Design a protein with these regions (language model features):
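Active-site-adjacent betaalpha module
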Residues: 1-24, 50-58, 82, 86-218
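Short, contiguous, helix-prone interaction/anchoring segments in small proteins
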Residues: 22-54, 63
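Short beta-to-alpha linker loops that shape the active-site pocket of alpha/beta-hydrolase fold enzymes
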Residues: 31, 68, 177
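Short, active-site-adjacent cap segments at secondary-structure transitions
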Residues: 33, 69-73, 156
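Conserved protein kinase catalytic core
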Residues: 35, 72-73, 128, 182
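Von Willebrand factor
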Residues: 55-74
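Glycine-rich loop at the start of a catalytic domain that most often binds anionic cofactors/ligands
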Residues: 74-81
């Protein structure tokens, strides 16, 4: 691990970033109403579940993001415009709140049910950091890097990775445990992140092995 003049550790490799004292797992929007929209949703759920099991076994902190939508009467400009686009309606009166708090589609899928020791952060925007407690909680835990997986790459994972990097974290994208609503758009998002140098990249099997390895090394 390289150091700068101030002796700040700079993780450069996946192994360096996966320090159990300084890494967390962030599971992005694995909700019933989102997973059900993707043909490969069950496969993404399985891979995310494997990573989650390994992180729990290795003692890594786990956070979930969960998208919620306000009642239509309280939606802002962004929420209304996005809902009109995604719901393919032309009139504001026809917009429906897609993920109201407490609804079936808002819930985390049962196979990934959070434990009492894990946190779920609700949000109304795409980045898991914007307007939530996530940054505060990670810093309180001494976290410097986070591994991210879930749905959808091109909608919320990319902005979460970019904002996380702007906040000083080292994001690790678990590529094959990230699902995209539009595969081409998802690949473009990964390409943008690679070009920017914001993140490290891995797959579910590799990072799961590192998580399990932390169990034997502690």
């Amino acid at each position: 691990m390289e150091k700068r003049i101030s002796e700040l550790d700079i993780p450069r490799t996946l192994e360096e970033a996966c320090d159990p004292k300084h890494m967390a797992l962030l599971i992005y929007d694995m909700q019933v109403g989102i997973v059900d929209q993707l043909p490969h949703g069950p496969e993404i759920t399985r891979r995310v579940g494997n990573v989650l099991d390994a992180a729990r076994d290795g003692g890594f902190p786990v956070f979930f993001s969960r998208h919620m939508s306000l009642p239509t009467e309280l939606m802002g400009i962004f929420q209304i415009r996005q809902a009109m686009t995604w719901q393919q309606v032309d009139r504001i009166e026809d917009v429906k709140s897609p993920f109201p708090q407490g609804s079936a589609q808002w819930q985390i899928v049962p196979d990934l049910e959070p434990l009492p020791s894990e946190a779920v952060s609700d949000k109304i925007v795409m980045s898991a950091f914007e307007g939530t407690f996530l940054d505060f909680a990670l810093r309180d835990q001494g976290i410097r890097s986070f591994a991210i997986c879930g749905i959808a790459t091109e909608v919320g994972i990319e902005p979460t990775v970019r904002q996380g990097a702007d906040l000083g974290y080292v994001p690790v994208v678990i590529e094959d445990a990230c699902g995209a609503g539009d595969e081409a758009a998802g690949e473009r998002s990964l390409g943008v992140l690679r070009f920017a140098g914001d993140a490290l990249f891995t797959d579910a099997a590799t990072i799961s092995a590192l998580f399990y390895e932390a169990t034997t090394s502690t």
